[in-house]
Amino acid sequence: YCCHPACGKNFDC
């Protein structure tokens, strides 16, 4: 998963 703003649409915490 991606837990930081730079992930954009992939943000998933």
UniProtKB/Swiss-Prot annotation:
- Bridged cysteine pairs (disulfide): 2-7, 3-13
Q: In which tissues is it expressed?
A: Expressed by the venom duct.
The entry's cellular-component GO terms read: extracellular region; host cell postsynaptic membrane
Modified-residue entries (Cysteine amide), positions: 13
Q: Alphabetically list the UniProt keywords.
A: Acetylcholine receptor inhibiting toxin, Amidation, Disulfide bond, Ion channel impairing toxin, Neurotoxin, Postsynaptic neurotoxin, Secreted, Toxin
Source domain of life: Eukaryota
PROSITE patterns to which the protein is assigned, alphabetical? ALPHA_CONOTOXIN
Q: Mind telling me which InterPro entries this protein's record contains?
A: Conotoxin_a-typ_CS
GO MF terms listed in the record are: acetylcholine receptor inhibitor activity; ion channel regulator activity; toxin activity
> Where does the record place it?
Secreted
Q: Which residues form a coiled coil?
A: none
- What family is this protein classified in? Belongs to the conotoxin A superfamily.
What job does the chain carry out? Answer: Alpha-conotoxins act on postsynaptic membranes, they bind to the nicotinic acetylcholine receptors (nAChR) and thus inhibit them. This toxin blocks muscular nAChR alpha-1/gamma subunits.
Its domain comment says:
The cysteine framework is I (CC-C-C). Alpha3/5 pattern.
Q: What name does UniProt use for this protein?
A: Alpha-conotoxin SIA
What organism, scientifically named, is this protein from?
A: Conus striatus
